[in-house]
């Protein structure tokens, strides 16, 4: 049977009370963007669900485009029929015939919110179940663990039937929680942090520090490609590429070796915070994981964070490396991240960096250099690009220009 719509269930959005409307509106905008090259599609949002009216569009194409959209708990290809029992029976039989396998099992799960329909939910289950059993010989009922679950939703505007539920990306719609700057290196952790921030509704803009000739064009391109992977979940990621060579060279010359990494991170954070201010961001996201490296001890974080009062979101802070790697593999950033190109966090790394730097000493070391002027110069030369979905993202080839 040909499906005429996709039924979208909100999940967590249902708990948002008075703010629900703005979350649903944002989700509808994100869905519309994902379907932008399907002009026949229409989106209809309601308080507890959303419909995508296909108007002849390929439902499988719509499925693929819904899968990475945060804010969707689950969705189902569905059909709508009139409030007529014979039409419901015909649609139910057609759906189960298409979905069942030989010697399979099924159940009917009906819900009636339109009280004028002549049968209640239990009666619908019995009537439709009996009709299906009479017409499909090798099918039996299993109410606990069926192979096919036929859902029937009787509403004032019609009866909606579906046989399959696909899990969505869950979370909150990207953009519903505001904007933040993601400190995107070429490593494993920061893309995962960006993904998790997006899942909580944050619109991210990536900030990447580029230090030629110490870092290569391949390292820069790797970061752009990683941003492309993250764009899969939002449609597009703005990326700010910061020239960082001069600052790193001055740090190497003027700052004691043991705290080079601490001062470097402080300068990165200052620049990121200024970009956040210019771009009306509300927070900074990074991939710090507690205790993983010298700059990620609590003492180091305290010394680094002292340059800003802006909230720092660390989605992976309590994760083991293996947990982070699992997510990186899931979102298809791992193979990119392990490409052997140095980024600015790995150059000039001292053999024995301090794990417990003292803030007063750090500030004393910095006081002999006019870092303000260097930061201003770097900001004046930032390159900003719009990054779309990565061409090699793990989605079907025909969907590569999805957003």
UniProtKB/Swiss-Prot annotation:
GO terms for molecular function: ATP binding; CCA tRNA nucleotidyltransferase activity; tRNA binding; tRNA-uracil-4 sulfurtransferase activity. It is an enzyme of class 2 (transferase). Its main location: cytoplasm. One of its GO terms (biological process) is thiamine biosynthetic process. Its EC number is 2.8.1.4. InterPro entries: Rossmann-like_a/b/a_fold (IPR014729), ThiI_AANH (IPR020536), ThiI_fer (IPR054173), ThiI_N (IPR049961), THUMP_dom (IPR004114), THUMP_ThiI (IPR049962), tRNA_STrfase (IPR003720), tRNA_sulfurtransferase_ThiI (IPR050102). ATP binds at residues 183-184, 208-209, 265, 287, 296. SMART domains: THUMP. Keywords: ATP-binding, Cytoplasm, Nucleotide-binding, RNA-binding, Thiamine biosynthesis, Transferase, tRNA-binding. It comes from the Bacteria. Pathway: Cofactor biosynthesis; thiamine diphosphate biosynthesis. Transmembrane segments: none annotated. It catalyses: [ThiI sulfur-carrier protein]-S-sulfanyl-L-cysteine + a uridine in tRNA + 2 reduced [2Fe-2S]-[ferredoxin] + ATP + H(+) = [ThiI sulfur-carrier protein]-L-cysteine + a 4-thiouridine in tRNA + 2 oxidized [2Fe-2S]-[ferredoxin] + AMP + diphosphate; [ThiS sulfur-carrier protein]-C-terminal Gly-Gly-AMP + S-sulfanyl-L-cysteinyl-[cysteine desulfurase] + AH2 = [ThiS sulfur-carrier protein]-C-terminal-Gly-aminoethanethioate + L-cysteinyl-[cysteine desulfurase] + A + AMP + 2 H(+). It is found in: Cytoplasm. SUPFAM superfamilies: Adenine nucleotide alpha hydrolases-like (SSF52402), THUMP domain-like (SSF143437). Residues 60-165 form the THUMP domain. Pfam families: ThiI, ThiI_fer, THUMP. GO terms for cellular component: cytosol. NCBIfam families: tRNA uracil 4-sulfurtransferase ThiI. PANTHER family: TRNA SULFURTRANSFERASE. Catalyzes the ATP-dependent transfer of a sulfur to tRNA to produce 4-thiouridine in position 8 of tRNAs, which functions as a near-UV photosensor. Also catalyzes the transfer of sulfur to the sulfur carrier protein ThiS, forming ThiS-thiocarboxylate. This is a step in the synthesis of thiazole, in the thiamine biosynthesis pathway. The sulfur is donated as persulfide by IscS. Belongs to the ThiI family. This is Probable tRNA sulfurtransferase. It comes from Listeria innocua serovar 6a (strain ATCC BAA-680 / CLIP 11262).
